[in-house]
């Protein structure tokens, strides 16, 4: 399952077949180009810039999208300052949405595990993706954190026009938020359909 995510995001090049997004081939493209096209992901194990602050994690995620170059950055041109201000506003907005605004200047490694998971999702969302891939986001979360994750995923899907691809073993979470489910075991597809079809 994770191998599929790795192929979709450019970490692996598939040995056969094609991957299309809006009729454009993704296979073989570098990950940063795929991310600029609106396809981003989280990982099974939290991947944050642990020594950076919470807000710095969200700012660095937006660098690939800034429309400013080295020259404008060195001279701090009006367009550079505007882009930086917009990135900071977007970061603050997402920190507020995930309940971490008060921890903006805290080192990311000092957050509780559930907060680190939410920060990783916010880091993806500041890039304004069309497709967000979550690789076992509920792993290691307690029931309260899993419920908060469920609510966050529903908000992303319903209010931010983001398609969510989810690899998850928590079947209550999967059944509660999914429109469509694909069941795969050891790389072999077993079933696919709506939650109701899978349940029956």
Where in the sequence are the language-model features?
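Glycine-rich phosphate-binding loops of nucleotide-dependent enzymes
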Residues: 2-200
């Amino acid at each position: 399952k994770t191998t599929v995510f790795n192929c979709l995001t450019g970490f692996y090049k598939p040995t056969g077949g094609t991957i299309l997004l809006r009729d454009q081939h993704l296979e073989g493209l570098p990950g940063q180009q795929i991310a600029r096209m609106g396809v981003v992901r989280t990982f099974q194990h939290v991947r944050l810039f642990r020594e950076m602050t919470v807000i710095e994690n969200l700012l660095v995620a937006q660098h690939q999208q800034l429309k400013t170059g080295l020259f404008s950055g060195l001279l701090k041109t009006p367009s550079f300052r505007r882009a930086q201000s917009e990135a900071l506003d977007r970061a603050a907005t997402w920190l507020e949405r995930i309940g971490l605004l008060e921890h903006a200047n805290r080192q990311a490694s000092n957050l509780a595990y559930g907060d680190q998971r939410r920060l990783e999702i916010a880091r993806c969302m500041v890039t304004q993706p069309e497709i967000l891939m979550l690789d076992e986001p509920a792993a290691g979360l307690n029931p309260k954190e899993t419920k908060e994750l469920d609510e966050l995923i529903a908000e992303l899907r319903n209010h931010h026009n983001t398609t969510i691809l989810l690899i998850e073993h928590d079947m209550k979470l999967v059944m509660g938020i999914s429109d469509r489910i694909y069941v795969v075991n050891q790389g072999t597809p077993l079933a696919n359909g709506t939650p109701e079809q899978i349940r029956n």
